[in-house]
Amino acid sequence: MCISLHLTVYRSNKCLLLIFIIPISWNLLIKNILFAFGLSSVLWLAKTIIHLLSSLNSSQVMIYSSYYMMGETFVNRFMYMMLGFISSMVLLIMSSDGLSLMLGWDGLGITSYLLIMFYKNYNSSSSGMITILSNRVGDVLILWSLGLMFYSKSWDYMFLSYFSLSIMLLFILSSFTKSAQLPFSAWLPAAMAAPTPVSSLVHSSTLVTAGIYLMIRLSPSFEESGCFLLVVMGALTSFFSGLAAFGENDLKRVIALSTLSQLGVMMFSLGLGLTLFCYFHLFAHALFKALLFMCSGVVIHSLGVQDNRRMGGVSSMLPYTSYIILVCSLSLMGFPYLSGFFSKDLIIESSESLCMLFPSVLMLVSCLLTSTYSSRIAMVCLCSYNYNLSCQYSDEEGEYLTPLFVLYWGAVMGGYIFLLMFSGGDVSIILGPLKSFLLLSLITVGVILPYFVKSFSLSLSHYVSSMMFLPFITGRTSFMPLLMGELLYHEGDCGWVEEAGPSLIHHNSLRGSSLFSFLTSSPYKVLILSSLLFTLFMYFY
């Protein structure tokens, strides 16, 4: 599809980073040290927009949570943890120096760990452990990069083009862990053990988008030449997650894998130097993905199951929710003139024009898979027969529908509004015959394919949905380092290191203090005798 968009900032994406810059800095000059410790907050247009978007999604999810979590024992604790999670994301968005970045980055990891483990069962505990360990890798890489930035005498990463390649590589790898790019993708589907409001917030504009946001901030360093690592890993992540979503039967995990696929698209566009298009897709995706998770929560709450093989007849029980799910699925496919269409099509067309054959083919196949699993959700959940006759009651009440309809208009109109904002109001869309045929073919084949491939065999389904046994591979890879760490802890910190270090010093200190106390509190005869012996000792030796 040939799209002509008169975007004044398309070829100069740095303008996006320099509009409305209002620096507010406090320099704490350390005496006799050449290093200036700077705490700064820089307000620019892109940061302000994503902050408003995160605030909009967070407010609607909090309203949704107050009704969805009604009846839970520790609902107040849950709400406070959600507020901490949102505050960490706000701190990350508003930061422009390494220290505040680290506080927000680490706060997201800790609060997400607590929220995933909200339900007290083995699945939640194991999922929380996978999440925190994966995010710890990114935290270590961030700390490492901050240590290297110390030698540049500033932690302000507003202009990172002056930094070395090693610092950029550390930031890229840390963003891979937070945004669940290969090979750190295992934790994202596992995080679906959390309550549905947490999933809605995590996958729309907070945790998983933190890595993308960091790469957008660092994009001036590589947007001219591109980054082939981001291109390849983004395309592979999008392809494997789309294939896994096609073989998955858990409704929430399918939506989570669709998020992972779109994160791969964003990384792919960043690697090509299409920073504005990546930001556009992040904006559009956040609008309909939060809505899609909230609708899935209504369906799961009404039917009492998450397995889409046991769902059906939802359109007759939940007509409004079914309609919103259909609109969100079409937007996820990139159906013309919905929010997902504008950004995704720009990325695909630009990737074709840049003549990168293998990643572009993978991205086209990923778009086909996106249409396939989105159609499968609609076919199984909305159109098929309901086999769960004991749970036919509706949860479509005013309290649930209010946040859904607020975000619905964003999912329908948000992409076009964003396009008007960054094009100056001059937008013309011309559909060429060849590329419009390619777009319609991808959507049509994706819609028809689930009717022919209605089910996988058990072994094939497990193989595909696990992203080619990625959790097993990454788990076995981390087994030996964790085992060595446990052995070093028990044999070292709790063994001979403890006995030869702190314990020995403690015992010797106790003995010395006891002897000193005995000498100072003894009768005068003992004190005089000890003084005499000490004098004789000093005289002869």
UniProtKB/Swiss-Prot annotation:
Topology of this chain in the membrane: Multi-pass membrane protein
What top-level branch of life does the organism fall under?
Answer: Eukaryota
One GO cellular component assignment for this chain's record is: mitochondrial inner membrane
UniProt entry keywords in alphabetical sequence: Electron transport, Membrane, Mitochondrion, Mitochondrion inner membrane, NAD, Respiratory chain, Translocase, Transmembrane, Transmembrane helix, Transport, Ubiquinone
Q: What is its EC number?
A: 7.1.1.2
A single Gene Ontology biological process assigned to it is: ATP synthesis coupled electron transport
Compartmental location:
Mitochondrion inner membrane
- The enzyme's first-digit EC class, named in words, is translocase
Name the Pfam families for this protein.
NADH5_C (PF06455), Proton_antipo_M (PF00361)
Listed GO MF terms: NADH dehydrogenase (ubiquinone) activity
Bilayer-spanning residue ranges: 17-37, 48-70, 74-94, 98-118, 130-150, 157-177, 191-213, 226-246, 263-283, 285-305, 322-342, 353-373, 404-424, 429-449, 455-475, 518-538
Q: Which reaction does it catalyse?
A: a ubiquinone + NADH + 5 H(+)(in) = a ubiquinol + NAD(+) + 4 H(+)(out)
Primary location recorded for the protein, binned into one broad class? mitochondrion
Q: Which family is annotated? A: Belongs to the complex I subunit 5 family.
- State what this protein does: Core subunit of the mitochondrial membrane respiratory chain NADH dehydrogenase (Complex I) that is believed to belong to the minimal assembly required for catalysis. Complex I functions in the transfer of electrons from NADH to the respiratory chain. The immediate electron acceptor for the enzyme is believed to be ubiquinone.
The protein, known as: NADH-ubiquinone oxidoreductase chain 5
Originating gene? ND5
